[in-house]
Regions:
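Conserved short S/T/G-enriched processing/targeting/catalytic segments and their helical context
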Residues: 1-103, 127-166, 179, 190-224
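Short, surface-exposed beta-strand-loop junctions and turns on beta-sheet-rich folds
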Residues: 17-20, 114, 121-124
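Conserved phosphate-donor
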Residues: 100-121, 172-188, 192
């Protein structure tokens, strides 16, 4: 999956794998990491950062982690008013070559309600076109929707991004255990974090305590990795 987004300073993309340019290669003939304007008007090597990424004619100050398999998951933290998930949906609908085929993306909105985006190379469907999302967004596996919806909508205190990530990974091992984290206050992007099982257990226990008493979560197994 690839979404081109911009945090106002840097383009936070690991690499683009859904677009190919045969003329952008290294001395061994292998493709170089690069970014491309959505209308294909400009192409930049990954080492270049002095340009302004545009999504559907506007800046979207956001974070995402981009992976090249369906099992990678992403986070977006929207920072300013006016930049909402609708603009991402419109972008995806008009630039479908940026999307993985037959993928489902889970969105947690500012009210901790989950919504599902479905995309193929033929269409982009969304049931979320209302207010901007200000809370962390997780893109992941579609089968997580029902359970996570119960968890997030019954939380007495909203989960923070790290708790959301670890909870999702604990319930759905297919999401893996590594992730990227961007600190909005410091602007520091830490790549490929792999927490210890002890830290994961501690985070999960803290998150579960936030869940309202009317919801009885199942025990969360943490697989030793």
């Amino acid at each position: 999956m690839t979404l081109v987004v911009w945090d106002g300073k840097d383009l936070l993309v690991d690499r683009v794998t859904t677009i190919t340019q045969s003329d952008i290669t290294d001395e061994n003939g292998k493709p170089k990491p690069y970014y491309v304007e959505l209308d294909h008007s400009k192409i930049y090597l990954a080492s270049e950062s002095n340009w302004e990424a545009k999504v559907w004619g506007r800046k979207v100050k956001a974070f995402t982690m981009v992976g090249d398999t369906e099992y990678r998951h992403c986070w977006l933290n929207f920072l300013e008013t006016g930049d909402d998930i609708h603009s991402i949906a419109e972008t995806a609908k008009n630039f479908q070559h940026l999307l993985s085929p037959n993928a489902e993306y889970i969105v947690i909105d500012e009210d901790d309600v989950l919504h599902v985006f479905q995309s193929t190379h033929d269409m982009f469907l969304s049931n979320y076109y209302s207010t901007p999302a200000r809370k962390p967004i997780i893109f992941g596996c579609g089968e997580a929707v029902e359970h996570l919806n119960n968890v997030f909508t019954s939380a007495s205190d909203a989960f923070n991004p790290l708790e959301c990530m670890v909870m999702a990974q604990a319930h759905y091992p297919i999401l893996g255990c590594r992730f990227d984290h961007w600190n909005a206050k410091s602007g520091v992007l830490t790549r490929d974090i792999n927490l210890s099982d002890r830290v994961r257990q501690m985070i999960v226990r803290k998150a579960i305590r936030k869940i309202a008493v009317n919801y009885k979560p199942q025990p969360v197994p943490i697989v030793n990795r």
